[in-house]
């Protein structure tokens, strides 16, 4: 193993994932990005940023615990950035169970894998303004209470609090 930091980015083909991969590559990281098996992933953002050839793309599915564990075990990343999600609010109303399984339980699967493989792996969980939902004060800040109004918002709020719980419980 080299001293190069390794990062795993779920959702690397999205806007945030693409720009994060570019930043980490510029900082000298070895970057792994995930794509769902069988999905017709669009790599246009990664191509536009001229980083696709420098990213190790891995088949990955937040629904499959064993796949998550094997991926983390084989890469042994120093950092994991969980940007993947079923993020379309209207779809979350049509498919609330799938949305929750991907966003909420998918996060738990990653957290539990980190706990069993290497508790020193740093973990970032992406959030969304949808977690605030119905707000009384604008703008929101760290004191604004969550009041999600969609299955998507609820699932991301669950992921947020699960991340806090794991950090506080398994420090």
Say what each PLM segment does.
Residues 1-171:
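N-terminal Rossmann-like NAD(P)+-binding domain of SDR-like oxidoreductases, especially those catalyzing
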């Amino acid at each position: 193993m080299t001293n190069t930091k390794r990062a795993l980015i779920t959702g690397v083909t999205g806007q945030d994932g693409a720009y994060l991969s570019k930043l980490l590559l510029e900082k000298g990281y070895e970057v792994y990005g995930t794509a769902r098996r069988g999905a017709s992933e669009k790599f246009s953002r990664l191509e536009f940023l001229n980083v696709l050839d420098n990213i190790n793309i891995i088949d990955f599915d937040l629904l499959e615990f064993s796949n998550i564990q094997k991926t983390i075990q084989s890469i042994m990343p120093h950092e994991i950035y969980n940007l993947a999600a079923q993020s379309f609010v209207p779809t979350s109303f049509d498919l609330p169970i799938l949305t929750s399984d991907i966003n909420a339980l998918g996060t738990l699967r990653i957290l539990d894998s980190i706990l069993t493989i290497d508790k020193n792996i740093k973990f970032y969980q992406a959030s969304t303004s949808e977690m605030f939902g119905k707000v009384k004060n604008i703008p929101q800040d760290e004191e604004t209470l969550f009041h999600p109004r969609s299955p998507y918002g609820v699932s991301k709020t669950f992921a947020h609090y699960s991340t806090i719980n794991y950090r506080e419980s398994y420090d």
